[in-house]
Regions:
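Histidine-acidic metal/acid-base catalytic patches
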Residues: 2-25, 30-43, 48, 53-69, ...
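Active-site acidic/histidine proton-transfer and metal-coordination neighborhood
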Residues: 14-23, 34, 98-102, 115-209, ...
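The substrate-binding groove and active-site-proximal loops of carbohydrate-active enzymes
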Residues: 110-118, 252-255
Length: 311
């Protein structure tokens, strides 16, 4: 009996020992399958602080850059009109140097539905693009003009929209900058079908796709599906989440809404879109969080996904 008990103890000890010996091999095999390091260098737009090309609103550019820099985002985007206003006072270059956060892109809205304005619009877009270029920006986000959606008929303006986008994109790329269509709610290109119709018809040699994934979701589309369908053309992106609540025009800090952000980020990383992803959240007077708190919440979410920030 004693011999049998000793044998059982021996076999149990051996089994435990073999299990312990096998564990490092399993861990080593698992380690080899770890997700590759994230490469995206994610930036932030400035509208969260209320930075718009309106009298007085451009004053918020400095608080925006201060917070964007403090939280280690890699670059910023704003309106060229805002940049120009600060530059004319000799304050922009020193401010960018002070906060050590580079300009990546400028946001320009162009009239796409009125051919009589085309010539003047081209001149205006070129002038604003040169402001972006002056401060080492590399991308122009080309947005459609606003319309009254309840009475708007896309098909009536389809040809003008495509023609205008081709003209504007050619003018921007002639400067050596890249540009892409940025669909937006409340404009002449909002819905999924409008986006597909336009992107399948424009000259994509010049005009790429610069989607706002939150705007896509709010407009009724599956943002991840749209990004997947046009992935080879995606050269810039506004990374935004959508919750449909009363704050921030229905948007929210990343990770709090319905947009499939991990899938979208993995897709854009797979095609090498390293420096042209911009977090964005609309401003909200008396919102539940300060702009800085929304940035910190979003940053924490991105860090959980493996993204890194400047230190």
């Amino acid at each position: 009996m004693i011999g049998m008990l000793e044998r059982r103890r021996f076999l149990k000890t051996m089994a435990l020992g073999l299990g312990t010996m096998a564990l490092p091999s399993f861990e080593t095999a698992f380690a080899k399958k770890k997700t590759p390091a994230k490469k995206l260098k994610i930036g932030h737009t400035c509208i969260t602080w209320g930075t718009f090309p309106r009298p007085g609103d451009d004053a918020t550019l400095e608080p925006a850059l201060k917070d964007i820099s403090a939280e280690g985002f890699w670059s910023f985007e704003t309106f060229p009109e805002v940049l120009d206003n600060w530059d004319k006072r000799g304050l922009l270059a020193p401010m960018i140097a002070k906060y050590s956060v580079p300009l990546r892109s400028g946001y320009i809205t162009g009239n796409l539905i009125d051919p009589s304005k085309r010539k003047d619009e081209i001149a205006r877009i070129v002038a604003l693009s040169k402001v972006v270029q002056k401060f080492n920006g590399t991308f122009v986000v080309l947005a459609p003009n606003s319309v009254k959606r309840d009475t708007y008929n896309f098909q009536e303006h389809r040809a003008d929209i495509i023609s205008a986008l081709n003209d504007y994109a050619a003018a921007v790329t002639d400067l050596g900058l890249a540009t892409g269509l940025h669909q937006h709610t409340g404009t002449c290109i909002e819905s999924r079908d409008e986006v597909y119709t336009v992107m399948e018809a424009v000259n994509t040699k010049n005009l790429k796709f610069a989607p706002d994934v939150g705007q896509l979701q709010k407009g009724g589309a599956d943002a991840a599906k749209v990004v997947k369908d046009f992935l080879p053309l995606v050269k810039h992106m506004h990374l935004k989440d959508y919750k449909g609540w009363e704050w921030y025009s229905g948007y929210c800090p990343l990770g709090m809404g319905t947009v499939d952000l991990p899938t979208i980020l993995d897709m854009v990383e797979s095609v090498g879109l390293i420096n042209d992803v911009m977090v964005e959240l609309d401003p909200s007077p008396n919102g539940p969080m300060t702009p800085l708190q929304t940035v910190q919440t979003t940053k924490a979410y991105l860090q959980k996904l493996g993204y890194t920030f400047r230190t």
